[in-house]
Amino acid sequence: RIIIGNNVLIRTNVTIYVDTIIHDNCWINHNSIIRENVKILDDSSIGSNTICENNVSIGKRCLIQNNTMICSGSIIESFVFIGPGVTLTNNSPIGHLRDVKPIIRGPKLRLGCAIGGGVTICPGIEIGEESVIAAGSVITENVLPRIIISGNPAQKTKNIGKKGLIKKEIRKKYGF
């Protein structure tokens, strides 16, 4: 079954599969695909032409821009920004598949991180709380909380500081 909350805007040519829950005040924009067992919490927006594979969790007040690929098994916590054309990848073994046991490990994007446009995040990677990934970067290793990284492969540019990116009143309003 599909559960859709109050005040949800679903634009034209969107496909939503079974066992999906979309909470209140969300937007799902044109031509997007939401696969099975996806949960999208309050006040989040999914951009046009975005593909959200199965078994994905998206937190509160996330902004996922156009043409993004969210692979199976991804966890996107609350207040996450994902720029246009971002690709999240999971484990797809290369080589002889007959002897390979499938293991799906999507990335984990922690609270309040910001991902610039055109970024690629490799399987099983964790992006730390309130970190910033510069546009076009390729993320091959876990990212610590509250740092800025850029490049291919991405490397630390600088620290963000203890205040972080999310304002106190916003944290309080949403219970974080």
Where are these regions (language model features)?
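Sequence-level detector for tyrosine residue identity
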Residues: 17, 174-176
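Structural signal for interior beta-strand "rungs" in well-ordered beta-sheet cores
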Residues: 1-150, 154-156
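A glycine/serine/threonine-rich, flexible loop-to-helix segment
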Residues: 146, 160-174
